[in-house]
C-alpha cells in the first residue's frame, strides 16, 4: 500500500502545544497523530489510528493464542449490576453517570466485570463448559479530576480487558500465568521496556495482583525494586520488613514532660536534645525516636464518617497512595477544625495513644512499632509529651497499617538488600479476582459430582490507547518520534528530495516496487523544500527513510535508519530488494 503525503490528511506543527507537559504529548500532537477535543479527550487522526490499530492487533493475536474469544459489550451500561457489587458507590466521582428520558440511571463503563459475570452465568451451566477466557477491546470512561499528559491519562481510553472463568483455583492460577506470559510476549513485540511489580487490587477486589509498568521518568506510579533479588513492587504494595520485638521487662517507666512550643516533630526533637533525657544518654534524639499520630476520618461506601489514627515513626510521612490503598474501598479525609471541636480529647500537636484508645478511636500503627519499642509521643495535653512510652506495655494498637512512605535504602521485604525507587506508567494489570463477582451474582454451575460449584475469576487489562503514548515516550529523540517496526504507521518513508522529473518518476516507481513486495510505503510527493520534508520525516518517526535526492543522477538512493541515524547509499537497480531485506 502506498500513501501519498500530498493526499494524506496531515498537518505537522513546528512548535510544541502550550499545554503539553510530556514528550509523548508534544510529539503526538506536533506530528499530527492526535488532536485534543476537550480535557482528556482526543481525536485519532490517520497516522495515529494506524499505530493504534497495529497495537490493537498484536494484543488481539496474543489473546487469541491463549484461547481467548473476543466479544464486545456496550459502553453505556445500566446501574443495577454495579449496584449489586456496590461499585456504583465505590467508584465515587470517577464514574460518569447519566439518566435516560425515563429517569433510569446509567453509567459509561469504567470496567466490565459485572457484565462478563452475568453473561457467562446466563450462557453456561456445567463444569464441562470451562475453562473459559473472554476478552474485549473497548472504550472506557473515567471522570479523571485532572486529565494530564495527553492520552497517557485521559477521560476516554481504550483497553483490552479479558476475564477467565474456572471451576477451581488451580484453573484460575493456570489462566493467570497464561495471561502473564502473553503480556510478556505482547510487550516484547511492541518493544516496550517494562517491569512486573506486585500490586494492590483496589476497587477491583481479589487476591494476587501484578502490574506491568513501562519504565519512564514521567510515570505517575512509583515502584521499588531490589537489585540483588529482583523483587519489585508498586509502592502501594510494599510490605515493611518487620523488626523483631524487643524485651519489655526492665525498661524504665514512661515519664510525662513539659514541652512548651513543641507541636511539631522538628521542635520536639530540638526540645529532647536539650532536655538531657536519661533514656538517650550518649546519643542524640532523632525524629525516628518519635511516634507521630496522624488523624483522619474514614467512611466505608454508604457508611458514616469515623475517626482513625495512624501512628508512624516521626521521621516518616504518611504516603497518601499507600494510605488510600490500605483503606480501600473506604474513602478518607483529614480532620478539619469542626472535627477537633467535636472531639476535645484530640489536642492538636500533642495527640498520643492513650486518649485515642480510651475514647474508642481506632488506632493503627506502622509495622515497625513492635512490642518493646519505646517512643516519644504526645501526652494528650497542651505542651506535654511522654518519653519512653513502650508498645505492648503502655499501649496496644488495634492493628498495623502499611501507610508510611517507602524510601530508597529501606530493606527489601525478602531481606536480600536495599530498595531503590523508579517511576513507571501502568500498561497492564492482572488480578486473581477469585469469587468476589461470582458471589455477588451467584454464578454457579453444576460440578462433576452434580453439586453446584461457584465459578472463580481472573481479570486482565492492557491499556491499548495508552501504549501509543508509552511507546512514543520511550522511543523518541530531539528530532521526533521513532516507532518500532511492529507498530510504525508505515514500513518505509520515501522522500523525494530532487525536483528533477526523472527523480520523481523513479521515486514513484520505487515506491510501487516496495508496495508489490508487501511493504507499507509513505511517499512524500509534496512540492515542499527538501528541508521541510526531512524535518517531517524525522518528526513522523517511520523507522526507515529512503531519500531520492542528489544521488539519483548517479544511480543511487540513500537509506536512513531513524533509530541509529546511520545512512548508506544503495544502487537504484537493486534498491527495492535491498530495502526489503533490511526492513524485514
UniProtKB/Swiss-Prot annotation:
It catalyses: tRNA(Pro) + L-proline + ATP = L-prolyl-tRNA(Pro) + AMP + diphosphate. Gene3D superfamilies: Anticodon-binding domain, Bira Bifunctional Protein, Domain 2, YbaK/aminoacyl-tRNA synthetase-associated domain. Its EC number is 6.1.1.15. CDD domains: ProRS_anticodon_short (cd00861), ProRS_core_prok (cd00779). SUPFAM superfamilies: Class II aaRS ABD-related, Class II aaRS and biotin synthetases, YbaK/ProRS associated domain. Keywords: Aminoacyl-tRNA synthetase, ATP-binding, Cytoplasm, Ligase, Nucleotide-binding, Protein biosynthesis. Homodimer. Belongs to the class-II aminoacyl-tRNA synthetase family. ProS type 1 subfamily. PANTHER family: MITOCHONDRIAL RIBOSOME PROTEIN L39/PROLYL-TRNA LIGASE FAMILY MEMBER, PROLINE--TRNA LIGASE. This is Proline--tRNA ligase. It comes from Mycobacterium sp. (strain KMS).
Amino acid at each position: 500500500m502506498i500513501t501519498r503525503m500530498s493526499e494524506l490528511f496531515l498537518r505537522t506543527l513546528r512548535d510544541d502545544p502550550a499545554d503539553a507537559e510530556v514528550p509523548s504529548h508534544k510529539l503526538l500532537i506536533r506530528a499530527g497523530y492526535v488532536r485534543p477535543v476537550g480535557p482528556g479527550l482526543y481525536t485519532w487522526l490517520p497516522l495515529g489510528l494506524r499505530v493504534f490499530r497495529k497495537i490493537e492487533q498484536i494484543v488481539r493475536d496474543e489473546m487469541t493464542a491463549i484461547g481467548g474469544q473476543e466479544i464486545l459489550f456496550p459502553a453505556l451500561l445500566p446501574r443495577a449490576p454495579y449496584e449489586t457489587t456496590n461499585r456504583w458507590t465505590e467508584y465515587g466521582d470517577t464514574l460518569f453517570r447519566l439518566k435516560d428520558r425515563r429517569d433510569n440511571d446509567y453509567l459509561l463503563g469504567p470496567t466490565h466485570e459485572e457484565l462478563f459475570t452475568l453473561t457467562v452465568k446466563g450462557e453456561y451451566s456445567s463444569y464441562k463448559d470451562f475453562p473459559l477466557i473472554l476478552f474485549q477491546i473497548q472504550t472506557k470512561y473515567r471522570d479523571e479530576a485532572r486529565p494530564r499528559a495527553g492520552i497517557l491519562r485521559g477521560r476516554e481510553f481504550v483497553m483490552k480487558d479479558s476475564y477467565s472463568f474456572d471451576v477451581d483455583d488451580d484453573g484460575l492460577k493456570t489462566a493467570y500465568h497464561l495471561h502473564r506470559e502473553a503480556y510478556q510476549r505482547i510487550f516484547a513485540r511492541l518493544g516496550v521496556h517494562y517491569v512486573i511489580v506486585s500490586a494492590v487490587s483496589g476497587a477491583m477486589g481479589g487476591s494476587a495482583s501484578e502490574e506491568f509498568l513501562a519504565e519512564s521518568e514521567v510515570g505517575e506510579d512509583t515502584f521499588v525494586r531490589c537489585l540483588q533479588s529482583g523483587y519489585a513492587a508498586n509502592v502501594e504494595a510494599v510490605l515493611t520488613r518487620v523488626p523483631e520485638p524487643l524485651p519489655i521487662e526492665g525498661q524504665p517507666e514512661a515519664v510525662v514532660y513539659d514541652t512548651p512550643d513543641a507541636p511539631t516533630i522538628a521542635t520536639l526533637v530540638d526540645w529532647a536534645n536539650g532536655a538531657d533525657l536519661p533514656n538517650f544518654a550518649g546519643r542524640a534524639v532523632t525524629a525516628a525516636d518519635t511516634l507521630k499520630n496522624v488523624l483522619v476520618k474514614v467512611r466505608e461506601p454508604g457508611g458514616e464518617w469515623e475517626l482513625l489514627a495512624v501512628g508512624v515513626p516521626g521521621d516518616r510521612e504518611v504516603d497518601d497512595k499507600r494510605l488510600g490503598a490500605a483503606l480501600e474501598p473506604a474513602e478518607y479525609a483529614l480532620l478539619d477544625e469542626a472535627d477537633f471541636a467535636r472531639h476535645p480529647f484530640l489536642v492538636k500537636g500533642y495527640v498520643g495513644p492513650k486518649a485515642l484508645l480510651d475514647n474508642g478511636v481506632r488506632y493503627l500503627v506502622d509495622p515497625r512499632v513492635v512490642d518493646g519499642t519505646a517512643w516519644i509521643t504526645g501526652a494528650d495535653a497542651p505542651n506535654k509529651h511522654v518519653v519512653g512510652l513502650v508498645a505492648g506495655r503502655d499501649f496496644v494498637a488495634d492493628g498495623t497499617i502499611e501507610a508510611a512512605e517507602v524510601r530508597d535504602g529501606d530493606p527489601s521485604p525478602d531481606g536480600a538488600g536495599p530498595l531503590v525507587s523508579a517511576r513507571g506508567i501502568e500498561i497492564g494489570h492482572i488480578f486473581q479476582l477469585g469469587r468476589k463477582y461470582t458471589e455477588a451474582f451467584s454464578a454457579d454451575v453444576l460440578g462433576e459430582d452434580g453439586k453446584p460449584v461457584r465459578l472463580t475469576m481472573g481479570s486482565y487489562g492492557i491499556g491499548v490507547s495508552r501504549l501509543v503514548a508509552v511507546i512514543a515516550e520511550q522511543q523518541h529523540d530531539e528530532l521526533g518520534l521513532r516507532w518500532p517496526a511492529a507498530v510504525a504507521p508505515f514500513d518505509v518513508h520515501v522522500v523525494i528530495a530532487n525536483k528533477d522529473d526523472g527523480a520523481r518518476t523513479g521515486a514513484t516507481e520505487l515506491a510501487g516496487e516496495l508496495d508489490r513486495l508487501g511493504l507499507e510505503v509513505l511517499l512524500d510527493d509534496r512540492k515542499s523544500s527538501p528541508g521541510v520534508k526531512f524535518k517531517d520525516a524525522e518528526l513522523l518517526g517511520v523507522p526507515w527513510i529512503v531519500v531520492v535526492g542528489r544521488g539519483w543522477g548517479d544511480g543511487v538512493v540513500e537509506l536512513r535508519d531513524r533509530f541509529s541515524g546511520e545512512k548508506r547509499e544503495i544502487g537504484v537497480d537493486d534498491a527495492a530488494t535491498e530495502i526489503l531485506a533490511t526492513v524485514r
